[in-house]
């Protein structure tokens, strides 16, 4: 068995506050990490820490980029045990998008359509929660997640375990003290 991590965050950016207003959820963004240290953390989001657009596939880092700029980012980090072959399929799904970044776009229309309770999905287009759901389902994991997915929905995954809740910048310190 291996572990993957579902990382829910709220940076406090204007866009994240808008999302929070219409979802009424604690967290406005989700990433998937393939390691406990969150060095292999991926999502769809802003490409530039200073501008919300354009967005796209991002390899996120706790201590640089958007999360470095927004030091008070709140986070809830969950672990999920997966079989070795499921882990490999998740890795391969992420790698496929990472290697072919160009055709993949940020689904900004789909993100805002949630406020209207509409699902708008275009091929090769994701917002953060769609991407994480896609990554999990590519491995064959039964998620039972809704079609109109929000970051908070990942808390309902079967066998998911809360590992940490607090500021994202303090997670690595907490993680290292446990090791």
Identify the role of each PLM range.
Residues 1-179:
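Cysteine-nucleophile amide-bond enzymes
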């Amino acid at each position: 068995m291996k572990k993957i991590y579902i990382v829910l965050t709220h940076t406090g950016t204007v866009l994240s506050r808008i999302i929070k207003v219409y979802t009424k959820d604690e967290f406005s963004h989700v990433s998937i990490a393939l390691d406990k240290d969150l060095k292999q953390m991926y999502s769809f989001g802003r490409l530039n820490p200073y501008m919300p657009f354009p967005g796209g596939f991002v390899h996120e880092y706790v201590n640089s980029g958007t999360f470095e700029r927004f030091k008070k980012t709140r986070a809830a980090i969950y672990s999920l045990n997966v079989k070795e072959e499921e882990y490999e399929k998740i890795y391969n799904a992420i790698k496929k998008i990472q290697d072919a970044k160009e055709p993949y776009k940020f689904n900004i229309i789909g993100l805002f359509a949630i406020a209207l309770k509409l699902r708008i999905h275009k091929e090769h287009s994701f917002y953060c929660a769609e991407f994480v759901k896609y990554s999990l389902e590519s491995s064959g994991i039964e998620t039972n997640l809704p079609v109109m997915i929000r970051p908070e929905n990942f808390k309902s995954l079967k066998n998911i375990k809360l590992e940490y809740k607090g500021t994202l910048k303090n997670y690595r310190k907490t993680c290292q003290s446990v090791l």
